[in-house]
């Protein structure tokens, strides 16, 4: 009996545990799901929920003012964000995988999955990010059950053939350019899919269970097969965090518009028109940006 339960754990045959949360670390029903979400108390992978804010959050390809956004500027905006996150998290250890979801569903939009080489590194990052802010928004950090991203990513999206668009329940991983990849990862190969660390048979079943799981996807999207609860679910409403501005200032080193707001030395937000694509070699280094952020934090904490 125990062997049977272990063999079906995390699959559609498991009527107790949610297979979507187990494989993807997110479920559209959230806490209202009829199956259990077994949240790990420790993991080599952390998720920063809804952290990446696309410039076209309301309508794809259009900014908040209804103006079309240059795809180059959108990619530039994303790569600025990616570089910021990678450099900050690299302080805690070697980042093996950093995936940013390009999905549009509430429970997956902007999710950032970070897998470290060692579990202790993930714990250090998890603890350090508690109560911090990024770009004026609290950071929501949790341990994620995902350790093998091959089972979590959408193959059809990678082949440009996913007909579910941004509302697919598998990860649509947004890609960075080759230049930034070489800069961040150097000669080592970026393991974008991660790796399974558990010796349990449930991690060795391979593509058979993944294909069975995918065949059940349409029933899940329709709310059938034992799933209950409304859409949306998990993640964007209940922000938690500290009282002061910490770790923020990101998301807008080169871009423009409302998403690219800067913070001056007094912590006040100032708006500017979108600058042109920066091609000048004069650009702040990561150390200079971090020094400014630390200065802002100290000044805000010293204020009565």
UniProtKB/Swiss-Prot annotation:
Residues 221-258 have a biased composition (Gly residues). It is found in: Nucleus. Residues 184-207, 268-280 have a biased composition (Basic residues). Residues 208-220, 281-304 have a biased composition (Basic and acidic residues). Belongs to the splicing factor SR family. SUPFAM superfamilies: RNA-binding domain, RBD. Residues 184-304 are annotated as: Disordered. The gene is U2AF35B. One of its GO terms (cellular component) is spliceosomal complex. One of its GO terms (molecular function) is pre-mRNA 3'-splice site binding. This is Splicing factor U2af small subunit B. Keywords: DNA-binding, Metal-binding, mRNA processing, mRNA splicing, Nucleus, Repeat, RNA-binding, Zinc, Zinc-finger. Necessary for the splicing of pre-mRNA.
């Amino acid at each position: 009996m125990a062997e049977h339960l272990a063999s079906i754990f995390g699959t559609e045959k498991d009527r107790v545990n949610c297979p979507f949360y187990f494989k993807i670390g997110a479920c559209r029903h959230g806490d209202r799901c009829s199956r259990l979400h077994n949240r790990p108390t420790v993991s080599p992978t952390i998720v920063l929920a809804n952290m990446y804010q696309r410039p076209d959050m309301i309508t794809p390809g259009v900014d908040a003012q209804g103006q079309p956004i240059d795809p180059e500027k959108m990619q530039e905006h994303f790569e600025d964000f990616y570089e910021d996150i990678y450099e900050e998290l690299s302080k805690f250890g070697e980042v093996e995988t950093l995936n940013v979801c390009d999905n549009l569903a509430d429970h997956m939009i902007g999710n950032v999955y970070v897998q470290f080489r060692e579990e202790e590194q993930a714990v250090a990052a998890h603890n350090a990010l508690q109560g911090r802010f990024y770009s004026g928004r609290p950071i929501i950090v949790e341990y994620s059950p995902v350790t093998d991203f091959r089972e979590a990513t959408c193959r059809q999206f990678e082949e440009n053939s996913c007909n579910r668009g941004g509302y697919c329940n598998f990860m649509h991983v947004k890609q960075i350019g080759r230049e930034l990849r070489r800069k961040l990862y150097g000669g080592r190969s970026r393991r974008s899919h991660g790796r399974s660390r558990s010796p349990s048979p449930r991690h060795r079943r391979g593509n058979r269970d993944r294909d069975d799981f995918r065949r059940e996807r349409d029933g899940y999207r329709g709310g059938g097969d034992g799933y209950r609860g409304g859409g949306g679910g998990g993640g964007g409403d209940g922000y938690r965090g500290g009282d002061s501005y910490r770790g923020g200032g990101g998301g807008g080193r080169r871009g423009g518009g409302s998403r690219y707001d800067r913070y001056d030395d007094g912590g006040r937000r100032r708006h500017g028109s979108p600058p042109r694509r920066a091609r000048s070699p004069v650009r702040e280094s990561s150390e200079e940006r971090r020094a400014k952020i630390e200065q802002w934090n100290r000044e805000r904490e010293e204020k009565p």
